[in-house]
């Protein structure tokens, strides 16, 4: 009995877990389920309350839209989603080591940040998981409808799911595994062979993990080693511009006694680039112009002043780094190969200058480790909201819809600019002729021409008065 009251307080410690277990049993039996999630044609029944409580994405879907049927993008792996859905009821998630990146991608889209954080911890503590993923490229393929059973596989984890998982468990338990991890990563960095096209993104992540493990050498060393990458790796649809000379002494320090067989010097960099240039064919000039346009859009980070015609253009940030995101972009990959080879040829002449600039930036205190929220494509962000917005770009989501015409946009400021069409607001006014404009680009063009006309008329008037 509580002091000073006539009431008794009792607690049921296991009650909440028991409730979730019963809800999970109901879900498996299809009882009292009030929402269906469709992933690549596979239908998963669930409870709105559980989904809304475990995922902000589902919370928006069931509360704001009152959806009874939610269709997820085809890039989502049905088996991965089923395991994540099961974890919402059980609080446990078994992730095969080669598929951790797939779980990270799915959880990022669903905004289940507790899963994202755990996946990030596993990747940071076990960088060899990425090395295993390089050898299991086929694991990213979504199961076909003829061979996939959406209701059976996740419940057979005791027999099939644990076959790969103990590997990651052993890596976490063994002290000596850290040395083998560094050796394995260093061997990836010192290879002369070209990596597969679907592993360029993972290789950037390998460099990141090496930088985090060697953080004892100082902030500048960590920042420097973070941006190192192999002499050449097949690019995604967007060309990478981070070509940096790898110092042999840096590799020796990072590997702690590892025998480095390859020595990278200026001659080998040029030789590797020349080999790349001979392997790729010349593309038409029109295709090159299209590539430059796409590259400019990515570098502009969807600038607020972009023209409305560009709002509906989708950019594949992942490129060929994952089979789910590759789609029908084989032509774009060829363009990326040729473009990156050209960029590398230009950078090889000034490679020492690039290294000097990088070292100077590291001494100024700029470190990529400050961005705590990474994306699978290799980009990192300082805030979760930025990563959410970035993930919507990957998946082609358009969450902002116009209530008048129904047109949808990726970014909120795109919708704000679109609403000017319906409201008729013209916020830009010319100071010379007082003409008003709805769009900023049109306003700037008019001001340029109007100013020239005004100055010409004024000069003509002055000449007439002088005569």
Swiss-Prot record:
Gene3D superfamilies, sorted? Classic Zinc Finger (3.30.160.60), Potassium Channel Kv1.1, Chain A (3.30.710.10)
Task: Name any GO cellular component annotation.
Answer: nucleus
Q: Where is the composition biased (Basic and acidic residues)?
A: 164-174, 182-194
UniProt record, GO biological process: regulation of transcription by RNA polymerase II
* Residue ranges of every copy of the BTB domain listed in the record: 33-97
Subcellular localization is given as: Nucleus
| Primary localization class, coarse | nucleus
Q: Specify where the region named Disordered lies, as residue ranges.
A: 134-153, 162-225
Where on this chain are zinc fingers (C2H2-type) annotated?
373-394, 400-422, 428-450
The UniProt record lists the Glycyl lysine isopeptide (Lys-Gly) (interchain with G-Cter in SUMO2) crosslink at 182, 241, 247, 297, 358, 458
Sequence positions bearing Phosphothreonine:
423
Q: Which GO terms describe its molecular function?
A: DNA-binding transcription factor activity, RNA polymerase II-specific; RNA polymerase II cis-regulatory region sequence-specific DNA binding; RNA polymerase III general transcription initiation factor binding; sequence-specific double-stranded DNA binding; zinc ion binding
Function in brief = May be involved in transcriptional regulation.
Oligomeric state and interaction partners are given as: Interacts with BDP1.
Q: Could you identify this protein by its name?
A: Zinc finger and BTB domain-containing protein 43
Give the source species: Homo sapiens
């Amino acid at each position: 009995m509580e002091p000073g009251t006539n009431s008794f307080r009792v607690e049921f410690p296991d009650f909440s877990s028991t409730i979730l277990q019963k809800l999970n049993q109901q879900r498996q039996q299809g009882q009292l389920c009030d929402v269906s999630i469709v992933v690549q044609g596979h239908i998963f029944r669930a409870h709105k309350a559980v989904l809304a409580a475990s995922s902000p994405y589902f919370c928006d879907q069931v509360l704001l839209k009152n959806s009874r049927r939610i269709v997820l993008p085809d890039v989502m792996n049905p088996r991965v989603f089923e395991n994540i859905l099961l974890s919402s009821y059980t609080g446990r998630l078994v992730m095969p080591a080669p598929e951790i990146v797939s779980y990270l991608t799915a959880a990022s889209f669903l905004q289940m940040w507790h899963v994202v954080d755990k996946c990030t911890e596993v990747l940071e503590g076990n960088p060899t998981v990425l090395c295993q993923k390089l050898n299991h490229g086929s694991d990213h393929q979504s199961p076909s409808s003829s061979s996939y059973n959406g209701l059976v596989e996740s419940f057979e984890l005791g027999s099939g799911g644990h076959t790969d998982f103990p590997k990651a468990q052993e890596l976490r338990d063994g002290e000596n595994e850290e040395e083998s991890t560094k050796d394995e990563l260093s061997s990836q960095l010192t290879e002369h062979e070209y990596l597969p096209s679907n592993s360029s993104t993972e290789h950037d992540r390998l460099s990141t993990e090496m930088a985090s493990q060697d953080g004892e050498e100082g902030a500048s060393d960590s920042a420097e080693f973070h941006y190192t990458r192999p002499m050449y790796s097949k690019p995604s649809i967007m060309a990478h511009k981070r070509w940096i000379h790898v110092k042999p002494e840096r590799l020796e320090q990072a590997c702690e006694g590892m025998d480095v067989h390859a020595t990278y010097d200026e001659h080998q960099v040029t030789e590797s680039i020349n080999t790349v240039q001979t392997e790729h064919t010349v593309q038409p000039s029109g295709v090159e112009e299209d590539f430059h346009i796409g590259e400019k859009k990515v570098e502009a980070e969807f600038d607020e002043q972009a023209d409305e015609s560009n709002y509906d253009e989708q950019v594949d940030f992942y490129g060929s780094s994952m089979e789910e995101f590759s789609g029908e972009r084989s032509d774009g990959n060829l363009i990326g190969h040729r473009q990156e080879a050209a960029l590398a040829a230009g950078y090889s002449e000034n490679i020492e200058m690039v290294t000097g600039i990088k070292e100077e930036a590291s001494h100024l205190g700029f470190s990529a480790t400050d961005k705590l929220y990474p994306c699978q494509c290799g980009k990192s962000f300082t805030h979760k909201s930025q990563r959410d917005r970035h993930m919507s770009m990957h998946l082609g989501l358009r969450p902002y819809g116009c209530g008048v015409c129904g047109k949808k946009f990726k970014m909120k400021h795109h919708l704000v600019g679109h609403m000017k069409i319906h409201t008729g607001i013209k916020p830009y006014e010319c100071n010379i002729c007082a003409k008003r404009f709805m769009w900023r680009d049109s306003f700037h063009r008019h001001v340029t021409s109007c100013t020239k006309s005004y100055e010409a008329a004024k000069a003509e008037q002055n000449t007439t008065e002088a005569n």
